[in-house]
């Protein structure tokens, strides 16, 4: 580029460099989209805009991509490196020819015909200044749509710092030429497909237009389902129809979001400023699969795990910066206090009560509102656990909202609904101290402005944050596979509850929990906490801690928990240095070296972070515990031990493997443990390697408390085979509390009611407990003897004496 065009672009770039601060989606386009910079790259933009072109250029130069203003020279021909699909509007409307883009596509394709070695990468790029969807009434032309020069100037002036450059996966023109030819008809088809691509991308970025809130309420009131519920309300409560209708409107006011793009923009600025000061980084993985779902027109339901109140803001912030529409979020009614409630409502929150029981009108209004969100095409987010995890483990799912999601499908008319499980991880959770108090029996504090300000005042260095998108679950595909007759239940008016609904919802919920855990994120804090809590004195030398982290990292890297889980790329030493900056540990120096200590008052709190990745290490920990206690064991015996205990572990930690997969998992982990020198293989027997016995013992300690808990319940069941489930749960907790006091077990979940409730249900499902009294006590005693061999003799004596003394 030379002469007047260079001067023109330089002059135009002066105001843009001041007004525009764009972000790239994805953050590293060359790496994440697999662009090969050694091969020719050309860019395709939706419509003619020099401002868009220069904004793209700034991002290309920042990410070491070819300059779009520098032409491509191929076989002596000079071609522009960018193509505008549409001429774009002007201040005065007139016909703008589209032939130029078709001609350029044809020129590029023709070069591929004459040069078989040529392969140009065509990269679609859209530049967005603002992403307001507009209202259903009022705005004819939301800012993202094609703007003429004057409109563009004002859009850039107002929205220049809320701009995104969205790179899409490249298209190989070589493949296009080989498969479809190089004539002008193919070039026209390519331009047409590109236009459709950009139209879909706009919808994915901004979402459908927003309704006026009152119009939405009027539509809901006019629905036959709510009209019938209003009549039932009037009849059952002996009130007038008008009063019952006012009750319905009041419930809509309580529930409904009041989405505001301006509030999104303002919050984005505040959160961007806040995250940069509180977090050292927010790590996002597998976002491209969600962008593709949005592009393909799926109705997306985000289903994250729930660690903290921060989840609401973090996930919306991440999605916005991934070029996706922030979802409508189901938030607990406890958050509907001033000023948080009105703010959350404008950020897309709709509020849900803890229980729907005894209020048919409320459940009907909520279900119809949720169905309306789906039918209008808004993405939705809800926490399937129902509340924040106090232990750091996934809670058993609450299936009410998920059931309503499937009922919305049974009304017909919605786009394909896809559930997206999300793992959210932190190196510091601001509520973790409160969680520990609640697990010890303290009453949960009601959310309020003073409590919120108190929490915010304590925010300091929060380390790293992690948002991992798991494997999506297309509901239609799932139902086609598991309930082929589901379409027979479609009813556009009534909320149907077919016989298959409850078991199917339970199965989907369990699958979602497994997929959330599959996307787990190991980090410096949870790895260091796992190692230090494994030590009985909660302290290790720096060398021992480094060796233990190396063991964990090698296990996770060489035998990954799943393809969606993430492990830090940093070394053990770097992770320890980072964890020490979080000020959770103490370092005691002596003449020999450093000792890293987890203080007693921090130990209970740090179990939360250990539990975040307990599922990722439980299998090697269990194997290490079995090998350590037996000193040597055959592969077959090891597998028998693991298979006997696996159903309880799978249910408690939502593990991913089926029973028939265990043999290959055990073999892979045993091979890795042998490679690390933790064990040796002699005559098909696994032996402890004395040189690395400490590392193996610390690895085994990860399963220690779980095995002790199982031993308690199996001993009680062995001692009293006719015990009922409720009593078994209660007595198991009592013994666990006694054990924790006598043996210094600092994990609050050790005697958590939910953990024992889940265990007892699994024992019933596995046949160890029977409501009809036909359980097999001999099998129960056999499992107890196996567990008794895996725990220390003093713990075993405490368990057995607890029942003997009663």
Swiss-Prot record:
Enzyme class: transferase
Biological process terms in GO annotation: CDP-diacylglycerol biosynthetic process; fatty acid metabolic process
Known EC number: 2.3.1.15
Molecular function in Gene Ontology: glycerol-3-phosphate O-acyltransferase activity
Comment block on domains: The HXXXXD motif is essential for acyltransferase activity and may constitute the binding site for the phosphate moiety of the glycerol-3-phosphate.
Gene from which this protein is expressed: plsB
Reaction(s) the record says it catalyses: sn-glycerol 3-phosphate + an acyl-CoA = a 1-acyl-sn-glycero-3-phosphate + CoA
Cysteine pairings via disulfide bonds: none
Domain of life of the organism encoding this protein: Bacteria
Motif placement: HXXXXD motif: 305-310
Name the record gives this protein: Glycerol-3-phosphate acyltransferase
Family, per entry: Belongs to the GPAT/DAPAT family.
CC annotations in GO: plasma membrane
HAMAP family, A to Z: Glyc3P_acyltrans
Keyword vocabulary terms for this entry: Acyltransferase, Cell inner membrane, Cell membrane, Lipid biosynthesis, Lipid metabolism, Membrane, Phospholipid biosynthesis, Phospholipid metabolism, Transferase
Species of provenance: Salmonella schwarzengrund (strain CVM19633)
NCBIfam families: plsB, PRK04974.1
Pathway participation: Phospholipid metabolism; CDP-diacylglycerol biosynthesis; CDP-diacylglycerol from sn-glycerol 3-phosphate: step 1/3
Bilayer topology annotation: Peripheral membrane protein
Subcellular location(s) of the protein: Cell inner membrane
Alphabetical list of SMART domains matching this protein: PlsC
Database matches in PANTHER family: DIHYDROXYACETONE PHOSPHATE ACYLTRANSFERASE, GLYCEROL-3-PHOSPHATE ACYLTRANSFERASE
């Amino acid at each position: 580029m030379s002469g007047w065009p260079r001067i023109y672009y330089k002059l135009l770039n002066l105001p843009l460099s001041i007004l525009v601060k764009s972000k790239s989606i994805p953050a590293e386009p060359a790496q994440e989209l697999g662009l090969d910079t050694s091969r020719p790259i050309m860019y395709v933009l939706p419509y003619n805009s020099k401002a868009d072109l220069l904004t793209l250029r700034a991002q290309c130069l920042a990410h070491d991509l070819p300059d779009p203003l520098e032409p491509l020279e191929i076989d002596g021909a000079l071609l522009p490196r960018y193509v505008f699909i549409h001429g774009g509007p002007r201040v005065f409307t007139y016909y703008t020819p589209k032939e130029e883009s078709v001609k350029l596509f044809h020129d590029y394709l023709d070069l591929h015909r004459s040069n078989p070695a040529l392969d140009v990468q065509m990269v679609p790029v859209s530049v967005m200044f603002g992403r307001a969807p507009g209202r259903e009434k009022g705005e004819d032309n939301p800012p993202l749509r094609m703007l003429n020069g004057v409109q563009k100037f004002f859009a850039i002036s107002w929205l220049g710092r809320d701009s995104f450059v969205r790179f899409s996966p490249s298209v190989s023109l070589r493949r296009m030429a080989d498969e479809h030819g190089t004539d002008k008809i193919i070039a026209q088809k390519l331009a047409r497909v590109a236009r459709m691509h950009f139209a879909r991308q706009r919808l994915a970025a901004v979402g459908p237009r927003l309704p006026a809130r009152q119009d939405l309420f009027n539509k809901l009131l006019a629905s036959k389902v709510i009209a019938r519920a209003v009549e039932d309300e009037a009849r059952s409560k002996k009130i007038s129809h008008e009063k019952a209708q006012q009750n319905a409107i009041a419930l809509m006011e309580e529930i409904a979001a009041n989405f505001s793009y301006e509030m999104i923009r303002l919050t984005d600025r505040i959160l961007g400023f806040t995250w940069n000061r509180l977090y050292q980084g927010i790590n996002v993985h597998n976002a491209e699969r969600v962008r593709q779902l949005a592009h393909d027109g799926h109705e997306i339901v985000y289903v994250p795990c729930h660690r903290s109140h921060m989840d609401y803001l973090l996930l919306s912030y991440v999605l916005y910066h991934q070029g996706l529409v922030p979802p409508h979020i189901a938030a607990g009614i406890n958050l509907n206090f001033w000023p948080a409630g009105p703010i959350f409502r404008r950020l897309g929150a709709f509020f849900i009560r803890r229980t729907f029981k005894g209020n048919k009108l409320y459940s009907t209004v909520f279900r119809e509102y949720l169905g309306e969100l789906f039918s209008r095409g808004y993405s939705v987010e809800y926490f399937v656990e129902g509340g924040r995890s106090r232990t750091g483990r996934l809670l058993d799912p609450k299936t009410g909202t998920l059931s309503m999601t499937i009922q919305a499908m049974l009304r017909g008319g919605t786009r394909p609904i896809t559930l997206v499980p999300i793992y959210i991880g932190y190196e510091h959770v601001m509520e973790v101290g409160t969680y520990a108090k609640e697990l010890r029996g303290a009453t949960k504090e009601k959310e309020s402005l003073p409590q919120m300000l108190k929490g915010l005042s304590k925010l300091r260095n929060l380390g790293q944050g992690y948002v991992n998108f798991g494997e999506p679950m297309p509901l239609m595909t799932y139902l086609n596979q598991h309930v082929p007759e589901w379409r027979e239940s479609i009813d556009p008016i009534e909320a149907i509850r077919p016989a298959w609904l409850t078991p199917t919802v339970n199965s989907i919920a369990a699958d979602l929990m497994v997929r959330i855990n599959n996307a787990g994120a190991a980090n410096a804090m949870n790895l260091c906490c796992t190692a230090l809590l494994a030590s009985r004195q909660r302290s290790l030398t720096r060398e021992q801690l480094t060796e233990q982290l190396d063991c964990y990292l090698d296990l996770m890297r060489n035998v990954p928990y799943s393809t969606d889980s993430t492990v830090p790329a940093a070394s053990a030493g770097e992770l320890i240095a980072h964890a020490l900056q979080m000020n959770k540990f103490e370092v005691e120096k002596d003449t020999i070296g450093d000792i890293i200590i987890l203080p007693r008052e921090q130990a209970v709190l740090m179990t939360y972070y250990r539990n975040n990745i307990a599922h990722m290490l439980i299998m090697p920990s269990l194997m290490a515990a079995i090998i350590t206690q037996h000193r040597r064991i055959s592969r077959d015996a090891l597998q028998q031990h693991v298979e006997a205990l696996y159903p309880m572990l799978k249910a408690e930690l939502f593990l991913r493997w089926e029973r028939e997969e265990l043999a290959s998992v055990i073999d892979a982990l045993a091979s890795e443990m042998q490679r690390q020198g933790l064990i040796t293989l002699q005559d098909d027997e696994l032996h402890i390697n004395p040189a690395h016995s400490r590392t193996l013992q610390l690895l085994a300690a990860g399963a220690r408390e779980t095995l002790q808990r199982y031993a308690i319940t199996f001993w009680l069941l062995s001692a009293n085979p006719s015990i009922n489930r409720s009593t078994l749960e209660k007595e198991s907790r009592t013994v666990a509390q006694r054990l924790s006091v006598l043996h210094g077990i600092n994990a609050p979940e050790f005697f958590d009611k939910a953990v024992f409730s889940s265990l007892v249900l699994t024992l019933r499902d596995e046949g160890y407990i029977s409501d009809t009294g036909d359980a097999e006590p001999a099998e129960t005693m056999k499992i107890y003897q196996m567990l008794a061999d895996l725990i220390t003799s003093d713990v075993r004596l405490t368990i057995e004496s607890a029942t003997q003394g009663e």
